[in-house]
Every structure is written in structure tokens, then in C-alpha cells.
Curated annotation (Swiss-Prot):
The chain crosses the membrane at residues 33-53, 62-82, 104-124, 147-167, 204-224, 256-276, 280-300. The lineage of its organism: Eukaryota, Metazoa, Chordata, Craniata, Vertebrata. Keywords: Cell membrane, Disulfide bond, G-protein coupled receptor, Glycoprotein, Membrane, Olfaction, Receptor, Sensory transduction, Transducer, Transmembrane, Transmembrane helix. Its main location: membrane. It comes from Homo sapiens. Coiled coil: none annotated. One of its GO terms (cellular component) is plasma membrane. This is Olfactory receptor 52A4.
Length: 304
């Protein structure tokens, strides 16, 4: 339990309580249905993708290994969010231990960072395949692919840890134990603190730039290089074919980063917002689209 200090201030709440969607408590049981359906679709779709890639030796190539990594990350990310969300909506179990909240936060931001890194790896692989097709087998060796997967996993996992330590060790006083959210998100938790959160905000923005910002820049540069190469192809049919193979990747890329930038804008700058519209857009960031992104990319790759 939390220890009261003065004027309702709490010293390091032992248990936090999720509010869910403020103002919609009476209909949250219905709101949970589409999230549950999306979660089940993501589990089934990504699991099928992993089984197909694992069982088919011809798919043990860099692009499909990255797709498998993206699929496993999608499963892990949605599993770290949706079950607790449904606990709140359906079973009225909004409480979570403070340390468990930090652990969920670490999982969510780590898996989001992995997704960003995998999208960068896929863009670089596509760039080499289109711009330097004869060098692809030399550049993207199995050893390099292994290093990339390990690197994109460790990068966010390590970068998020100082953020958690800053919350745990630096922020001791909280105005309330109520979180106006359905899962543990860094900004939502930091806003509860009554102490100076400048360091936490700076590190949060810095970490987001190191992971998402740099990935976005390099992905954009990769696709610029791809477009330059495509427009120099002599045959119109060849240009259209190569461009069509890039469309699904560009779609997933823009979907992921536009929602991510909207989330950052909402959490850091936009204070007064239409709650239900903003909430659904923000919630779609971790839970993903109706069709799992890796499965969507795989189907599109097979049709071109």
C-alpha cells in the first residue's frame, strides 16, 4: 500500500489502478470485444507465419527471417498489453503492482523498439536487393542477419532500463495511484509524480529518437535510394514490378511511424484533445492492424 505524506500525496504507491477509458466505464465490456478479436487474429496469423517460415527451407532467407522476427515481436507485444486490458474491461481487475507496471512498461517499449529495428532491417535488405542485386548474397549473410536480429533486440531492451531506474529511484512522490490508461505507459506514469520530471522527459525523448528517430531517417533514405534506382530502370514494366514489391513495406512503415509520431505528439504536447478519437488512435499503436503486419507483408511478397 502507498504511504500518505501531505495533501493526498503518496510515497511510492505499492499498487496502481488503471482507470481504463475515462467516461466510458459502463461500456468498456463492449469495447474489449474488438481488442480481443484483434488479439486472436494477431496470434493465429503470426503463429501460422512462423510455422510456415520455419517448416519451409526455401524461406530461410534474410527477408523472411526478418518477417518471422516481426511476427514473434507482434505476438509478444500484443500479449504484454491485451490480457491486462481485458482484465480491466471484462473482469474489473484494474490493479497492478508498481514493479509489475514497470516490467510491463519495459516489455512494451522494448517490443516497440524491436519492431522499429526490424522495419529498418527490412528496408535495408530491400534497398540492397533492388539497388545492388549482385551483392545481396555477399552483404546479407546468415551471420550478419543473426547480428542484426540480436542488435535490434538488445538496443531497446538496454535503452529502456535507465528510464525505469529514473522512475523507480528518482520519483518518490505521486499525487495519485490512478492511471488514466489501460496499460503502463511511461508518460502516463510520469505525469502522476509531483516531483521534477525534467530528466525523465529528456531521457524519454532522447531514447525515442535513438530508436525510432534514427530508424525513421535511415528507412527514409533507403527508400529514396530505391526510388532513384527504380526510376532509372529502362522498362516501364520493370519499374512497376519493383515498385509494387515496395508498396506493402511502405504501407507498414508509414502506418507504424505515423502512429508513433502521433503518440509522441499527443503525450508530450497536445494536452486538450478529443478523448475517444485520440484514445483509439493511440491504442492502435501497440495492438496493430486487423491483419497482422508480418502476415500482410508475406502475402504481398508471395503475390509479386
Amino acid at each position: 500500500m502507498a504511504l500518505p505524506i501531505t495533501n493526498g500525496t503518496l510515497f511510492m504507491p505499492f499498487v496502481l489502478t488503471f482507470i481504463g477509458i475515462p467516461g466510458f466505464e459502463s461500456v468498456q465490456c463492449w469495447i474489449g470485444i474488438p481488442f480481443c478479436a484483434t488479439y486472436v487474429i494477431a496470434l493465429i496469423g503470426n503463429s501460422l507465419l512462423l510455422i510456415i517460415i520455419k517448416s519451409e527451407p526455401s524461406l530461410h532467407e534474410p527477408m523472411y527471417i526478418f518477417l518471422a522476427t516481426l511476427g514473434a515481436t507482434d505476438i509478444s507485444l500484443s500479449t504484454s498489453i491485451v490480457p491486462k486490458m481485458l482484465d480491466i474491461f471484462w473482469f474489473h481487475l484494474p490493479e497492478i503492482y508498481f514493479d509489475a507496471c514497470l516490467f510491463q512498461m519495459w516489455l512494451i517499449h522494448t517490443f516497440q523498439g524491436i519492431e522499429s529495428g526490424v522495419l529498418l532491417a527490412m528496408a535495408l535488405d530491400r534497398c540492397v536487393a533492388i539497388c545492388y542485386p549482385l551483392r545481396r548474397a555477399i552483404v546479407f549473410t546468415r551471420q550478419l542477419v543473426t547480428y542484426i536480429v540480436v542488435g535490434v533486440t538488445l538496443r531497446p531492451a538496454i535503452l529502456v532500463i535507465p528510464c525505469l531506474l529514473l522512475i523507480k529511484c528518482h520519483l518518490k512522490l505521486y499525487r495519485t495511484k490512478l492511471i488514466y490508461h489501460t496499460y503502463c505507459e511511461r508518460v502516463a506514469l510520469v505525469k502522476l509524480a509531483t516531483e521534477d520530471v525534467y530528466i525523465n522527459k529528456v531521457y524519454g525523448i532522447l531514447g525515442a529518437f535513438i530508436v525510432g528517430g534514427l530508424d525513421f531517417i535511415f528507412i527514409t533514405l533507403s527508400y529514396i535510394q530505391i526510388f532513384i534506382t527504380v526510376f532509372h530502370l529502362p522498362l516501364k514494366e520493370a519499374r512497376l514490378k519493383v515498385f509494387n514489391t515496395c508498396i506493402p513495406h511502405i504501407y507498414v512503415f508509414f502506418q507504424f511511424y505515423l502512429l508513433a509520431f502521433f503518440f509522441i505528439f499527443y503525450s508530450q504536447i497536445w494536452i486538450l484533445y478529443p478523448i475517444i478519437c485520440t484514445y483509439h488512435l493511440v491504442q492502435s499503436l501497440p495492438t496493430g492492424p486487423t491483419i497482422p503486419q508480418p502476415l500482410y507483408l508475406w502475402v504481398k511478397d508471395q503475390t509479386h
